Amino acid sequence: MHILITSGGTTEQIDDVRGITNFATGKLGKILAEQFLTANHQVVLLAGLTALVPDDHPNLQIIRISNVDSLAIAMKHWVPKMDACVHTMAVSDYTPVYMTDLETVEKTKDIQSLLTRQNTEHKISSQEAYQVLFLKKTPKIIASIKNLNPDIILIGFKLMVDVSDAQLIQTARDSLYKNNADYILANDLTTISETHHKGLLISHNYIQKAETKEKIAQLIVSKSEEVYEKYNHRSNR
């Protein structure tokens, strides 16, 4: 199979020296890529700028991703060529529009007019005691994947914090239906550590638990191969 994996996190630039990012390390994406390579699949890894990545491999191509826009461009290029996509990347929900001092905001009668402005400085001044940063919502990358390739096997990820398994499963199933995914790997930040990572791989009628990143990766590889083989079997009948 030809596998597309997204991994790590995006960074949305405020100016040339500042940005909004997240704590994603890309460790699970790295392990996933290694497991797919071990199973003799071709892998394209879209990795955040600081994400962990595997060692060089003849069947591996690594492309570094900076922000949501660069991820969207890469997805449009690669998704139509792939058999499966494992979308683990922690994608920024918001991107900066404009940053200014609090006094300017307070004096502006039409606050929405600030949304049409852009910062032109390479480094925004840090002289002011308070700054206001306007953000706008970014497009949901996972929602575009099946539109780009209706036949792709799509495995998405849903991370929540300190919720019950029932809530985790329901939220994952909501994402499954909304994005037309084949599976969602649901996990809770409070159950993730250096040695432990509880994940629930969920489909419309299936739930399987894994307790480490390695086991999660093995499960995803196995299920991807299973769906691919079933699809090809039907296509070749």
Predicted regions mapped to residue ranges:
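A cross-family phosphate/adenosyl-ligand binding-site feature
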Residues: 1-237
